[in-house]
């Protein structure tokens, strides 16, 4: 059984919120971009509660940036649904 990968972030009020990485998605043919789909650990399991982050490599570190562009978000969710069904 695969171990769950948990990530923690702070919300607007500074509270720690934990998320499970439910999928890693790679888009693009030449320069593949990596994305992760996160689901709240304390959530109800509803896919609508999922968040999509782009994994950006900056210098020698990794940044997780929330995908806010509608088209980019739609493409990632489309690939995620392919994994589910």
Curated annotation (Swiss-Prot):
Cysteines paired by S-S bonds: none
Domain of life of the source: Bacteria
Family, similarity comment: Belongs to the UPF0473 family.
Name used for this protein in its record: UPF0473 protein CPE1618
Organism of provenance: Clostridium perfringens (strain 13 / Type A)
Classification lineage: Bacteria, Bacillati, Bacillota, Clostridia, Eubacteriales
